[in-house]
Each structure stands twice: as C-alpha cells, then as structure tokens.
C-alpha cells in the first residue's frame, strides 16, 4: 500500500501542472484549448533531448518556453486570424506532431538510460531519501501553483480573468482581449510543457504518442478537485487542480495494482466521467423540468 501511495503522490504532483493549465485556459479564459496533448509531448521531448546531452536543469525552463511558444501559435490563430479556439488548438496540435519528432531527432521515442536527470542528481546528493522524487515533484508543482495564484491577483491577472468573464466589457475598458488571451494561453501551455518535462525525466523516456488523452485526464482531475473543494475562489480553484490530480492518480494506481478494472478501460472511464461532469448542469435542468412537468400533470389530473 505504501508503494501505491508513493507512486500516486509522485504522479499526481508531476501531472498536476496540466490540471493547472486547464484551470487557466478552460475555467479562467473559457477557452477549450486542445493544444494540451501535443504540448505535453513537446515539453517531454525538449526536456529529454537536452537531458540526454547533459543539461537536465536547463531542460525544464526550455520545455516551458517551448510550451509557451505553442500556446502563442494557438493564440495567434485565434485572435489574429479568426480561427475558432477549438480549431486553433487542433491545427497547432497537428503541427506539433512534426515539431515533436524533430525535437526527438526524427525518432518516435527517446530514452535517457545512462543519463543523469534532476531526479537522479537529487538522489545522488542524498536529499529526500527514498522520497526524493516526490520531494522534487512537490517543490516544482507547489511553486508553479503559488506563482499562478499570485499572478491571478495582479493587475494583468485580473484583466485575464475579466477577459474570460466578459470580453466585450474588457474591450470597452480599453483593454486588448487578444493580448490577455495570448498571455493566458502562453502561461497555460508553459505549465503543460513543465509537466511534460518533469514526467519525461521521471520516466526517463518520451514517446511521440505519450500525450494522447492528456487533455481529458487533466479535465477529469480538475473536475474531481472542484467536486471536492468547489471553485468559489481562485485559491480554491488552484487547490482543486492539485487535489483532483492526486485523487485521480491514486484511483489509477489502485486500479493498476489491484486489477479491479482493466487498465485498458481507464481512459474510457475517464472520458465518461468528464462527459457526465460537464453535462451535469444540463442533466440537473432536465431532471428539474421533468419534476415540474410531472407536478403540473398531477395538479391537472385533480
């Protein structure tokens, strides 16, 4: 059980920046950014490639910068060329497939066997004992969460939040929604790149298809966290992303080790959970309408 808990905590914190990214793009900006899958692989590819040549620490900010560039492309397509947000993400995600192959030296996968990573360097320094991977994951993700919450309280962060709530009002206030959207998508994809970078070094490998379904998993984590903590404030929203990621990874680890549900079915279950959670308000309205309809028929019969 200790192994399950440790693995779940490690993966939960490592993948949490994806949930934070979706909190920013989906909840704050109200944009369905589908760049996430390709951006995650981009972060991992850049990180693994730089780590393989002896730069594991430089690999982290480089992966974030690459992710931010991907977000900027999506924002440019959306704000300057008038491409709908979903299509803009799909177009960027499609192009990233080739970019990711290029970052990996035109190979479908790349390994770090025999190379030092930020995790192995921490272990060799004797820091954290057997929990060194979890320690680093907590520090990196915790710092990202604190910086995000701090940013959302700044003038630019408030402008970004206002853009998601009412872009017309923002435009009337002499603010440029295109700029705030670009900043938001750059930050969101930088965090996705951070997650990819950390996971790539943690697993010591990257595969061209390793990002498949990441956006759905990130949404599931966010929705699970919001169900537990709610989202009545920015702080709760950020914490919900972290807590949801931990809960999801714990469930995943339990299922993986106990074989309660075939592992192959987990992504299907995740997709169903996300679909039901997003459709919950409509389902509730439909149920309320049916109750009112039944009550009206009952009164009419009397």
Please annotate each region the language model reported.
Residues 11, 86, 108, 133-137, ...:
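Loop-to-transmembrane alpha-helix initiation sites
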Residues 70, 129-215:
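Helix-loop-helix "hairpin" substructures at the membrane interface of multi-pass membrane proteins
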Residues 192, 196-267:
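Transmembrane alpha-helical segments in multi-pass inner-membrane proteins
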Residues 165-172, 176-179, 232, 239, ...:
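Cytosolic-side transmembrane-helix boundaries in multi-pass membrane proteins
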Residues 22, 55-94, 99, 141-142, ...:
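Alpha-helical transmembrane segments within multi-pass membrane transporters and channels
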Residues 3-55, 76-81, 223-231, 235, ...:
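Single transmembrane alpha-helix segments in multi-pass membrane proteins
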Residues 27-32, 72-117, 123, 204-208, ...:
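Short loop segments and helix-boundary regions at transmembrane helix junctions
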Residues 85, 89, 96-153, 182-183, ...:
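Transmembrane helix-bundle core of multi-pass membrane transporters
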């Amino acid at each position: 059980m200790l192994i399950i808990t440790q693995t779940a905590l490690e993966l939960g914190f490592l993948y949490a920046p994806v949930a934070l990214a979706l909190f920013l793009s989906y909840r704050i900006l109200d944009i369905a950014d589908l760049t996430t899958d390709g951006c995650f692989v981009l972060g991992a590819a850049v990180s693994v490639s730089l780590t393989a040549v002896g730069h594991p620490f430089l690999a982290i900010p480089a992966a974030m910068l690459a992710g931010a560039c991907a977000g900027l492309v999506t924002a440019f397509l959306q704000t300057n060329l008038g491409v709908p947000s979903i299509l803009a993400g799909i177009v960027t995600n499609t192009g990233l497939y080739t970019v990711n192959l290029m970052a990996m030296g035109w190979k479908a996968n790349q390994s770090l066997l025999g190379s030092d990573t930020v995790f192995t360097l921490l272990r060799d320094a004797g820091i954290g004992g057997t929990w060194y991977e979890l320690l680093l994951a907590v520090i990196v993700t915790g710092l990202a969460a604190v910086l995000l919450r701090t940013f959302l309280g700044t003038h630019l962060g408030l402008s970004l939040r206002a853009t998601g709530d009412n872009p017309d009002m923002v435009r009337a206030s002499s603010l440029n929604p295109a700029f705030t959207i670009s900043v938001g998508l750059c930050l969101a994809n930088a965090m996705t790149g951070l997650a990819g970078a950390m996971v790539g070094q943690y697993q010591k490998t990257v595969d061209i298809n390793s990002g498949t379904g990441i956006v759905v998993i990130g949404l599931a984590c966010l929705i699970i966290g919001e169900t537990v903590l709610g989202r009545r404030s920015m702080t709760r929203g950020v914490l919900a992303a972290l807590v949801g990621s931990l809960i999801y990874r714990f469930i995943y680890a339990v299922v993986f080790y106990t074989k309660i549900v075939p592992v192959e079915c987990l992504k299907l279950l995740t997709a169903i959970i996300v679909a039901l959670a997003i459709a919950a308000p409509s389902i509730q309205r439909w149920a309320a309408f049916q109750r009112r309809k039944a009550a009206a028929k009952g009164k009419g019969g009397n």
